[in-house]
C-alpha cells in the first residue's frame, strides 16, 4: 500500500453488560491514508420502467433484481422484479400486506430475511415468485437486520434498541442463546452524552457477514472505522481510513451539528468488503457524490471508486464483474459499471 500506517492501540475487553467475558486482547488500531487504486468512475444510467422507489432496497437473487415500489404506484406488491443484465421488467413479487408487518429486510445469499415482531421469515425466489420457505422465532423480534453466519447462528448489530455496549451479537437458534461480541470504540461518559441511547446513536454501526461464514465486519457511520472479527467474535483487525476533505474523527462528537456521516452501507463478498462512504457533513444541506471503498478481509485497503452520481443502495456481482447502484434522488434509474478491470 502507498499510504502510511500509523499504529495506535485498541484494548479490546469483553467485560461490559451483555458482552461475553473473555481474555483481554491487544489489537493495534491501524490508520490508512490512501488506496493502491483511486479511480474516478463514470456509471452507466439504465432507465427503469416501471419506475420504482429503489432508494434503500436493492435486492439481487440470482439474475433477478428486486427494487422496492411505492404503495401509491402498486398497492399489492412490495417489489418490481427485473432481469439482469439489461433491467428487463419481469413482474411484481412480494405481497405488500405480508411485507408490511416487517421492520426490515436483509439480503442473504439467494435469500431475503424479513424481520418482524414475532421473529424472522426467510424468502427465496421459486420460479418467478417470492415465497416464504421458513420462519425463525426470536426472543425479541425488534432486532436490527440479521445476517446468516451458519445453519444455526445469526449476527446482528447492537443499536440503541439493544442492551449492552457490544459491537454485535450472535444469536444461536438451536438453543435461543444470545452472545455479545466486541465493545464500542469509545467508553460511555455521561458528562459527554445525556444517556446511553445518545451514545449508541452517535456510534451507530452496521454489520455484514462474509458469505462463507468465517468473518464478520462492523462499520461505523460517523467515523471511518471498520473492524473485522472471526465467527466466534474475536477481533482480528481494527482499521480507520484517515484522510482529509472531510476528515474523520476517531471519537464522535455528541453535537449532531459537528457530525460527518461516513459509512452508509456495505456489501460483503468472499473476497472483499465494499463500503459506501458518503462523507457528508450533517450540518450542511449539500450532498456530494459518494465513493465506494474496497477492503479485503485482512483489513487492507484495495481501491476507492469515486462515483459520478449520488446513490443510496448498491449491489456487487464479482462473478460477473458488475456494480449496481440506486438512488433516492433518481428513482427511475439504476446505475452500473464494470468492476473487474478496476480490481486487477
Where are these regions (language model features)?
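Repeated scaffold domains used in trafficking and secretory/extracellular systems
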Residues: 52-59, 98-109, 140-153, 204-207, ...
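C-terminal motif of bacterial Sec signal peptides marking the signal peptidase cleavage site
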Residues: 16-18
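Conserved blade-ending motifs and adjacent loop-strand segments that build the rim/top face
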Residues: 245-253, 297-318
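Loop/turn-rich, solvent-exposed surfaces of beta-rich toroidal or solenoidal domains
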Residues: 257-294
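Beta-propeller blade signature
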Residues: 79-83, 168-173, 288-300, 338-341
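Short coil/turn segments that connect the beta-strands within blades of beta-propeller domains
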Residues: 62-64, 109-110, 151-153, 212-214, ...
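Beta-strand-rich domains and repeat architectures in extracellular enzymes and scaffolds
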Residues: 45-77, 274-278
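Surface-exposed loop and turn segments in beta-propeller and other repeat-based domains
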Residues: 33-49, 90-99, 134-140, 177-202, ...
Amino acid at each position: 500500500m502507498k499510504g502510511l500506517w500509523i499504529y495506535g492501540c485498541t484494548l479490546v475487553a469483553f467485560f461490559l453488560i451483555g458482552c461475553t467475558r473473555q481474555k483481554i486482547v491487544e489489537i493495534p488500531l491501524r490508520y490508512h491514508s490512501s488506496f493502491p487504486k483511486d479511480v474516478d468512475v463514470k456509471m452507466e444510467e439504465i432507465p427503469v420502467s416501471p419506475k420504482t422507489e429503489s432508494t434503500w432496497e436493492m435486492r439481487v437473487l440470482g439474475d433477478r433484481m428486486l427494487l422496492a415500489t411505492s404503495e401509491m404506484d402498486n398497492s399489492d406488491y412490495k417489489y418490481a422484479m427485473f432481469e439482469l443484465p439489461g433491467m428487463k421488467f419481469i413482474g411484481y413479487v412480494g405481497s405488500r400486506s405480508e411485507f408490511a408487518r416487517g421492520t426490515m429486510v436483509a439480503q442473504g445469499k439467494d435469500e431475503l430475511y424479513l424481520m418482524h415482531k414475532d421473529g424472522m421469515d426467510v424468502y427465496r425466489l421459486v420460479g418467478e415468485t417470492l415465497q416464504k420457505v421458513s420462519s425463525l422465532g426470536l426472543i425479541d423480534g425488534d432486532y436490527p437486520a440479521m445476517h446468516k453466519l451458519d445453519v444455526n447462528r445469526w449476527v446482528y448489530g447492537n443499536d440503541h434498541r439493544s442492551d449492552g455496549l457490544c459491537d454485535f451479537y450472535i444469536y444461536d437458534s438451536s438453543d435461543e442463546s444470545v452472545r455479545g461480541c466486541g465493545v464500542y470504540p469509545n467508553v460511555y461518559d455521561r458528562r459527554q452524552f445525556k444517556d446511553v441511547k445518545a451514545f449508541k446513536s452517535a456510534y451507530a454501526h452496521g454489520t455484514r457477514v462474509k458469505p462463507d461464514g468465517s468473518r464478520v465486519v462492523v462499520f461505523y457511520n460517523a467515523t471511518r472505522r471498520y473492524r473485522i472479527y472471526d465467527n466466534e467474535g474475536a477481533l482480528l483487525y481494527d482499521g480507520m481510513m484517515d484522510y482529509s476533505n472531510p476528515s474523520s474523527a476517531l471519537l464522535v462528537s455528541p453535537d449532531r451539528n459537528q457530525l460527518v456521516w461516513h459509512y452508509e452501507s456495505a456489501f460483503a463478498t468472499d473476497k472483499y468488503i465494499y463500503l459506501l462512504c458518503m462523507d457528508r457533513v450533517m450540518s450542511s444541506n449539500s450532498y456530494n457524490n459518494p465513493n465506494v471503498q474496497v477492503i479485503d478481509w485482512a483489513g487492507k485497503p484495495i481501491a476507492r471508486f469515486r462515483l459520478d452520481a449520488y446513490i443510496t443502495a448498491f449491489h456487487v456481482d464479482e462473478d460477473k464483474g458488475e456494480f449496481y447502484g440506486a438512488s433516492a434522488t433518481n428513482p427511475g434509474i439504476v446505475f452500473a459499471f464494470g468492476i473487474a478491470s478496476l480490481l486487477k
